[in-house]
């Protein structure tokens, strides 16, 4: 490669040539030779292509039994290279990114935004049990450790990230908020004041949205709550129940509703089973996707799972919903594949899901891009 004519080209010309390639091809070229890898990982080149549209991928969270180390027969830990499985819906392909550049044991990816993946990582020092919340870009292999948190937050908190990488860790009783700008390199702590455990919270448009069950032990009654993150000098969050008379019984017809971010910053998705009756434990006829316009506060039906596809979920006692934006994904026990709803192309199956013996996987949207750490 040293004698190749490409070495005679000035760096500006090479940057111009490679910046015209799709991100997929740039990643392939990085593995061709050491010269290409140095060129395509340089800060100058990354700054040039950081404004390029991202790859819209699905990243899978590791199974609960998955660890990046295992014990060998002699009782010693054997390291396994940590990685994250991702799916490219445009190419209908599974592949994975190595996370071996992170100085942490057992990294557990939990969220993503603006090209960064957020994960919990165990301290390398086996004598400590503390976990750190880390932001990283597996394409550039850069990372940043957020201010230290107690391990209880990783066990009980839900990590939320918005489009400008503001981070919240939310529990029923308290919330932590980090922007890196309001108070430099510190978490702000608030009391949550929620009536019950928040389900599938979403952080978007400087607001948090969550579902809470305010019903009785024998009958669920779901309500939608929101909280604006406008005054960060107070010590508690003011949650407001969003409801309109025109909504009617919309929360009564959905079984086990869950929220996801919609397309843009003004749409919220609610997904759940469509009840066939109003009895205490009704059967469901299919899975329904509803879309709420946050400006007009009007609901509309966005999608309804085809009956032949729903039969596989009907036979499963449990299923998961994840994704967001233009695509929603569904997994179920013993299914062996994912169902995907695309708001433009409808419903289809995704085969070849890796790493899940029981089929019940979880994941999140990963908009992969070559960008520098903020």
Swiss-Prot record:
Listed PROSITE patterns: FBOX
Biological processes, Gene Ontology terms: protein ubiquitination; ubiquitin-dependent protein catabolic process
Keywords annotated in UniProt: Nucleus, Ubl conjugation pathway
Highest taxon of source: Eukaryota
Keyword Nucleus: yes
SMART domains membership: FBOX
InterPro entries attached to this UniProt entry: F-box-like_dom_sf, F-box_dom, Kelch-typ_b-propeller, Kelch_2
Compartments in which it is found: Nucleus
Any Pfam family the entry gives: F-box
Pathway this chain belongs to: Protein modification; protein ubiquitination
One GO cellular component term: nucleus
Domain F-box: 3-48
Function: Component of SCF(ASK-cullin-F-box) E3 ubiquitin ligase complexes, which may mediate the ubiquitination and subsequent proteasomal degradation of target proteins.
Comment block on domains: The F-box is necessary for the interaction with ASK proteins.
Complex formation: Part of a SCF (ASK-cullin-F-box) protein ligase complex. Interacts with SKP1A/ASK1, SKP1B/ASK2, ASK11 and ASK13.
Protein name as it appears in the record: SKP1-interacting partner 15
The species this protein was found in: Arabidopsis thaliana (Mouse-ear cress)
């Amino acid at each position: 490669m040293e004698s190749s004519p490409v070495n005679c080209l000035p760096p500006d010309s090479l940057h111009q040539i490679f910046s015209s390639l799709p991100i997929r091809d740039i990643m392939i070229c990085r593995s061709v030779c050491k010269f290409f890898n140095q060129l395509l990982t340089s800060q100058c080149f990354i700054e040039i292509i950081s404004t390029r549209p991202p790859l819209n991928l699905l990243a899978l969270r590791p199974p609960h039994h998955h660890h990046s180390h295992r014990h060998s027969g002699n009782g010693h830990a054997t390291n396994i290279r940590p990685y994250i499985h991702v799916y490219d819906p445009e190419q209908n392909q599974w592949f994975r990114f190595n996370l071996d550049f992170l100085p942490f044991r057992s990294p557990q990816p939990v969220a993503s935004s603006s090209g960064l993946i957020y994960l919990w990582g165990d301290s390398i020092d086996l004598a400590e049990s503390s976990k750190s919340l880390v932001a990283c870009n597996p394409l550039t292999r850069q990372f940043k450790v957020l201010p230290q948190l107690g391990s209880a937050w990783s066990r009980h908190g839900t990590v939320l990230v918005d489009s400008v990488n503001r981070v919240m860790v939310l529990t029923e009783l308290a919330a932590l908020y980090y922007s890196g700008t309001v108070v430099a390199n510190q978490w702000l702590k608030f009391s949550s004041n929620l009536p019950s455990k928040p389900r599938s919270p979403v952080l978007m448009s400087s607001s948090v949205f969550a579902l809470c069950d305010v019903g009785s032990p024998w009958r669920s009654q779901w309500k939608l709550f929101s909280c604006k993150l406008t005054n960060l000098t107070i010590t508690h969050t003011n949650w407001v129940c969003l409801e309109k008379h025109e909504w009617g019984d919309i929360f009564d017809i959905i079984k086990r509703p869950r929220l996801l971010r919609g397309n843009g910053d003004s749409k919220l998705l609610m997904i759940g089973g469509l009840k066939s009756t109003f009895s205490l434990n009704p059967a469901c006829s299919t899975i329904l996707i509803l879309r709420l316009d946050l400006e007009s506060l009007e609901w509309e039906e966005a999608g309804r799972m085809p009956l032949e596809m729903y039969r596989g979920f009907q036979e499963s006692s449990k299923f998961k919903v994840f994704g967001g934006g233009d695509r929603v994904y569904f997994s179920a026990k013993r299914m062996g594949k994912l169902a995907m709803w695309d708001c433009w192309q409808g419903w289809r199956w995704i085969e070849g899901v890796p790493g899940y013996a029981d089929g019940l996987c979880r994941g999140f949207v990963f908009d992969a891009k070559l960008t520098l750490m903020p």
